[in-house]
């Protein structure tokens, strides 16, 4: 394990933690730094005409970062390193350059063959123009029923080809999902075409067209649209919805210092990159003046969307939306009051396009607070529930939304007042669709969601990457299962047969740590520090991973998607921490064959017996949903949530939210006093009051009606 400095957390308040600078080594590259990186590369290689695929921060080694953070000396501050992925026409593979921005020099450039770069917006937009002009594509459109003079009504969603043995990974290839619109505002997904062009991205031409053995002509049904004008034309009007306003008259409860945010005892760094999108680092909790580290880094590191139709070419449909396109590159500029509601703080994102120019996504990250419902409550039945305490919570939400062709992914990192950290993903957008004939047997691989529209079965599997730092660098993972107690009913040890307990298993090695969710045992995973025990329970301090939306990868072992997305074969993997091991499907995902599998399975195979007990570890968790489409998902899918929790267990002495002011608190002695003064009726009415803005739905405000009343 790398040497890390001693953690001084337990002796400092947040405001005095070292590293409280406005500029931090984990900050994303600024617009000026991106420009500088491009200038340095061009200066070093003036005769080259590179296309810039990626320019991003190379995060400093963990040990170096922590040494700087706790040394209080800027002399130890890690240098700013930019990682650039460059493309050169006629040169296979990619060029990977490392640029020292602090010293303004290229420190390394490496030519890597046998890999393909991420697909950028520049590449994708170009593809649609290429297919529209291709004679063979025009011919197939006409055969499908598209009028010859309406090629400008033909659209495509360009995807990476996934993997196709005809092309391997020596050329950068795309496949085009084809559609038709009768006008530019139509939803193309209600009129899919049945053929799939293959495009050589480098030569910018169509090299083949995959044509099904059974043709499916263009549907003559009207488009199924969802814009307001279309719904009003169909229904006559939109439904009446009275607005809900969110106000914070005293301002927000968080404060920003550079890219660091402090909120209700939490403190963390908010990063962002082209691939993972939001990255949260250096997460700690102020436990009554003791600053306790929780996680060094957390992110959604990869995802895969495998489709379930085995017919060619649909086996290629298993998008790695992060590794092949990038959640950062695909991120939306967020709109006030629409994507986020309330009192908002935004962070922009900066990227470099293929010509080396800096582009900015305004409002890429939304930071705001939401009402979190009842935080805790208890009432006493002895006085008809008049003795009561009830507190309402708020929650901090750090979010982004990215669009991957037809789908939208809404990513929410949510922090609760009781110390819980939640990751919520919401899936919306439009189903990927394919043409079908009237009355066609879909063989169970899909559902007709609209006349002649086939939506294939698919999954959305995400990989959460956690590098814990719970009260120190040496952590373990315990698999916790609920089990029935020993002994049958009537036995001495379990006479009534009702006994149950937990079975706690701590894997020692990487190989032993591979496991899956078990709903029968309510399985959870305690990420813990075995060196620090709770003074009451005697159990290790921990954060429990609670995740129940964990479908297995439906594709069979040995399938193309199983080989390429090896991280998705199991729900939990644990590996020793190593700098640079971030992406579980490998650094370069497009057009990998899966033979051998890159990323996480590769690292596990290298060191299957490496220790993951009481050391610096990374926890990889695959979760998601299996989606069998239905007509209610079309033409625009209602948002479907997926949630998981990181819940403190044996971490705090007691409920850490008890210092949140209650909305209502009446003690037994106060009830007795009110009874003595004849004010019980007024007390009962007071139980409805939570704040000055609350009111009755069909009457006047309570606080106005009883203004001046004295309750005790």
From Swiss-Prot:
InterPro entries in the record: Cu_Am_Ox_Cu-bd, Cu_Am_ox_TPQ-bd, Cu_amine_oxidase, Cu_amine_oxidase_C, Cu_amine_oxidase_C_sf, Cu_amine_oxidase_N-reg, Cu_amine_oxidase_N2, Cu_amine_oxidase_N3
Sites where the protein binds substrate: 319-330, 404-409
Single GO MF annotation: copper ion binding
SUPFAM superfamilies with a match to the protein in the record: Amine oxidase catalytic domain, Amine oxidase N-terminal region
Signal peptide (residue range): none
Chain residues that bind Mn(2+): 616-617
PTM annotation (2',4',5'-topaquinone): residues: 407
Entry keyword set: Copper, Cytoplasm, Disulfide bond, Manganese, Metal-binding, Oxidoreductase, TPQ
Entry comment on modification after translation: Topaquinone (TPQ) is generated by copper-dependent autoxidation of a specific tyrosyl residue.
Effect on the protein upon substituting residue 460 to A: Impairs copper amine oxidase activity
Name listed for the protein in its UniProt record: Copper amine oxidase 1
EC number: 1.4.3.21
Effect of residue 456 to A: Decreases copper amine oxidase activity
UniProt subcellular location: Cytoplasm
Function, in words: Copper amine oxidase involved in the metabolism of xenobiotic and biogenic amines. Capable of catalyzing the oxidative deamination of primary amines such as ethylamine as alternate sources of nitrogen to support growth.
Any GO BP annotation: amine catabolic process
Quaternary context: Homodimer.
Family from the record: Belongs to the copper/topaquinone oxidase family.
Main location: cytoplasm
Pfam annotation, one family: Cu_amine_oxid
Cellular component aspect of the GO annotation: ascospore-type prospore; cytoplasm; cytosol
Cysteines engaged in disulfide bonds, as pairs: 340-366
Active site: 321, 407
Keyword Oxidoreductase: yes
UniProt: Cu cation binding residues: 458, 460, 627
Cofactor: Cu cation; Zn(2+); L-topaquinone; Mn(2+)
């Amino acid at each position: 394990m790398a040497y890390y400095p001693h953690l001084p957390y337990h002796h400092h308040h947040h405001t005095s933690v070292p590293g409280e600078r406005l500029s931090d080594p984990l900050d994303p590259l600024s617009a000026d730094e991106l420009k500088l990186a491009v200038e340095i590369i061009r200066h070093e290689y003036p005769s080259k005409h590179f296309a810039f695929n990626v320019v991003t921060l190379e995060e400093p080694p963990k040990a170096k970062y922590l040494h700087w953070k706790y040394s209080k000396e800027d002399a130890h501050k890690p240098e700013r390193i930019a990682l650039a992925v460059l493309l050169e026409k006629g040169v296979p593979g990619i060029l990977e350059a490392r640029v020292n921005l602090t010293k303004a020099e290229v420190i390394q450039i490496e030519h890597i063959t046998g890999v393909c770069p991420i697909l950028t917006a520049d590449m994708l937009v170009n593809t649609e123009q290429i297919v529209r002009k291709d004679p063979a594509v025009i011919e197939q459109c006409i055969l499908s029923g598209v009028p010859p003079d309406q090629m400008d009504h033909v659209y495509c969603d360009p995807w990476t080809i996934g993997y196709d043995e005809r092309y391997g990974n020596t050329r950068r290839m795309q496949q085009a999902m084809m559609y038709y619109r009768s006008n530019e505002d139509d939803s193309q997904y209600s009129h899919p075409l049945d053929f799939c062009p293959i495009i050589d991205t480098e030569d910018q031409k169509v090299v083949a067209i995959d044509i099904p053995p059974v043709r499916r002509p263009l549907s003559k049904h009207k488009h199924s649209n969802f814009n307001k004008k279309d719904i009003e034309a169909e229904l006559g009007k939109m439904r009446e919805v009275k607005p809900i306003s969110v106000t914070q008259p005293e301002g927000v409860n968080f404060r920003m210092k550079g890219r660091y945010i402090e909120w209700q005892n939490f403190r963390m760094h908010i990063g962002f990159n082209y691939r993972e999108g939001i990255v949260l680092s250096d997460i700690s909790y102020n436990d009554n003046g003791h600053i306790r580290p929780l996680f060094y880094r957390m992110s959604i590191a990869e995802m895969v969307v495998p489709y379930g139709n085995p017919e060619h070419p649909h086996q290629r449909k298993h998008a790695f939306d992060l590794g092949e396109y990038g959640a950062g590159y695909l991120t939306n500029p967020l709109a006030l009051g629409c994507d986020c509601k309330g009192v908002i703080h935004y962070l922009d994102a900066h990227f470099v396009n293929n010509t080396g120019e800096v582009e900015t996504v305004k409002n890429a990250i939304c930071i705001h607070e939401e009402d979190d419902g009842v935080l805790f409550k208890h009432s006493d039945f002895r006085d008809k529930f008049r003795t009561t305490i009830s507190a309402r919570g708020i929650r901090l939400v750090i979010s982004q939304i990215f669009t991957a062709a037809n789908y939208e992914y809404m990513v929410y990192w949510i922090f609760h007042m009781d110390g819980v950290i939640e990751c919520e993903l919401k899936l919306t957008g439009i189903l990927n669709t394919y043409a079908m004939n009237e009355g066609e047997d879909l063989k169970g691989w899909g559902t007709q969601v609209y006349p002649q529209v086939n939506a294939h079965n698919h999954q959305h599997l995400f990989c959460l990457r956690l590098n814990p730092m719970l009260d120190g660098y040496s952590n373990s993972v315990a698999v916790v299962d609920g089990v029935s107690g020993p002994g049958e009913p009537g036995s001495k040890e379990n006479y009534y047969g009702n006994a149950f307990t937990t079975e706690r298993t701590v894997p020692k090695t990487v190989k032993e740590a591979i496991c899956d969710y078990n709903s029968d045992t309510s399985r959870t995973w305690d990420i813990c520090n075995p060196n620090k025990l709770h003074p009451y329970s005697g159990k290790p301090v921990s954060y429990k991973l609670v995740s129940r939306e964990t479908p297995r990868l439906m594709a069979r072992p040995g399938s193309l998607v199983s080989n390429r997305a090896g991280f998705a074969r199991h729900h939990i993997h644990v590996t020793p921490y190593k700098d640079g091991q971030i992406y579980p499907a490998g650094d370069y995902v497009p057009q990998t064959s899966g033979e051998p599998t890159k990323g996480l399975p590769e690292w596990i195979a290298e060191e299957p017996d490496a220790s993951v007990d009481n050391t610096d570890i990374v926890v990889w968790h695959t979760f998601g949903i299996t989606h069998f489409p239905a007509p209610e998902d079309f033409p625009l899918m209602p948002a479907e949530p997926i949630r998981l929790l990181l819940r403190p267990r044996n971490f705090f002495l007691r409920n850490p939210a008890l210092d949140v002011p209650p909305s209502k608190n009446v003690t037994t002695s106060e009830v007795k006093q009110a009874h003595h003064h004849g004010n019980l009726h007024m007390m009962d009415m007071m139980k409805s009051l939570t704040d000055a803005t609350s009111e009755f739905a069909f009457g006047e405000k309570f606080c106005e009606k009883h203004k001046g009343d004295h309750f005790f």
